[in-house]
Amino acid sequence: MLRQDLETVPVVLRNPAYLQPFELLVRLLPLPRYTSIDPTPFVAIFFPLFFGMILGDIGYGFILLLAAVSAILLAKRRIMRQAGEILLVSSIYTIVFGVLYGECFGELGTRLFGLRPFIDRQTSLVPMVYFSLAVGSVHVVVGLALGVVSALRGRQTKEAVFRSLSILVVICVAGILASYFAPVAALVRGPLITAVLVIIPILILTGGFLAPFEVLRYFGNIISYVRLMAVGLASVLLASIANRLAGAAGSVWIGVTVAILLHTFNILLGVFAPTVHALRLHYVEFFSKFMEPGGKDFKPLKTK
């Protein structure tokens, strides 16, 4: 069968039961072509991770966990149960990161429950930026690696070589940047710079004169992951404001009411913002590295 014929073959997403709910997020965009790669397993890994990194609060996580279990048990529509299963996994990541951040309804985790953060998001901005960039680098490199696999499947050897070299450049440049902050890594700075200088001419041979600019675009993609820190910081600041306004109220009942209303708003915003930004990072920065959209959903005339 010719490649152009394969591209018109209807597709079915087949994944293990625990991955199937995440097909819901993949189906929000046109399906991958028959010759492309199903991104569902990778969405199942990275989407909850990004969600938890952004929201990262024990109290919010438990509330979302209860909402997820309720949706799974009570919802009649399959799409709602799938959304509940996605939220269930994401809420667990939210609790885990909440422990790391020492946050439970904002800074109440530290003030009332004695939680000791491994990293304080309000004061450790630079480490959080580095962590976000590290996660982004891994995500982009995984996407490029899948692009190599996709190119080899399509017998596009030149494209596979280009993407492989791009991965090496990204890793080398990341190592060079890390060498300025880690004394041990400084020992390999020279060899890494030499490797980049050797790889660039080969990149031009395989991808044309604009190939280095294409690689630069990958670093632009990685910088986009700083939003994992920025949006998360906005969430914790809103929680802090809610607690302070509640504490400044003249009455206990007024304070409790204010706290409930503001934290409810923050939870709703905390579900919406991480979802949108996590999906954006997948759809724009990740899928573009390997997935060919345009697949037609297989709809059998009859099922047994």
What kind of feature is each model-predicted range?
Residues 1-304:
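Conserved, carboxylate-rich catalytic/transport cores that coordinate ions
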